[in-house]
A protein has these predicted regions:
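Feature captures hydrophobic
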Residues: 40, 46-47, 57, 78, ...
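Short, conserved beta-strand element in jelly-roll/cupin
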Residues: 47-50, 60-75, 116-119
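Short acidic-glycine-tyrosine-enriched beta hairpin
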Residues: 65, 79-107
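Actinobacteria-biased recognition of intrinsically disordered, low-complexity terminal regions
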Residues: 1-2, 146-170
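Histidine-centered metal-chelating micro-motifs
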Residues: 53-55, 74, 94-104, 122-123
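Double-stranded beta-helix
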Residues: 108-157
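N-terminal leader/capping segments at the start of a protein or of a new domain
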Residues: 1-22
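A short glycine-rich, His/Asp/Glu-containing loop-to-beta-strand
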Residues: 24-55
Length: 170
């Protein structure tokens, strides 16, 4: 079959959420469970027991489709033009990020999501500002991604310096 499009990943995430009953513990650290993995895709069920910011990251060439089962998440792409685009998603919503995309997600406490990656996730690139430059660090796909506090502060400072720019509404 081959790699799926980002839109196909989002559709698979929605179908997986609606057709599979997976139960994770109601307390403790956030957790993830692999729902399936084949040569074309891998699906993860994620539960955020506490609010969690993924920091800016990429999926090392894998497209992702996300379906929100419960709670809410915020997704923000890394802006190239200086205009921040933050979107909020609630239970029943789905969205996708292309394989070349850089984004961050903020999971509210209790958020439950299904993520489908194609091709299967091999690594995650984490982004942060170091000595004034944007740097990417490659990490394993099965560990929580670190926040990007300096990069986020740089974007917020740019918003403050240009008051005519505003966050996009959800």
């Amino acid at each position: 079959m081959g790699a799926l499009t980002p839109q196909e990943c989002a559709g698979l995430a929605r179908r997986a959420a609606l057709s599979r009953a997976a139960v994770l513990s109601p307390a403790g650290e956030s957790e993830s469970v692999v729902l399936w993995e084949d040569e074309d895709s891998v699906a993860w069920l994620n539960v955020a027991h506490d609010s969690r910011d993924t920091g800016f990251h990429d999926h090392d060439g894998s497209a992702v489709g996300v379906y929100v089962i419960a709670g809410g998440v915020t997704n923000e792409g890394l802006p190239a033009d200086g205009t921040r685009r933050v979107r909020r998603y609630r239970a029943g919503d789905s969205f996708w990020v292309p394989g070349s995309g850089i984004h961050r997600m903020d999971h509210e406490t209790g958020a439950v999501t299904v993520h489908v990656y194609s091709p299967p996730l091999r690594a995650i690139g984490y982004y942060e500002v170091v000595d004034g430059l944007l740097q990417r660090t490659l990490g394993p796909p099965d560990e929580p991604s670190p926040a990007s506090p300096r990069l986020l502060a740089t974007l917020r400072d740019a918003d403050t310096a240009a008051p005519d720019r505003s966050l996009s509404p959800a």
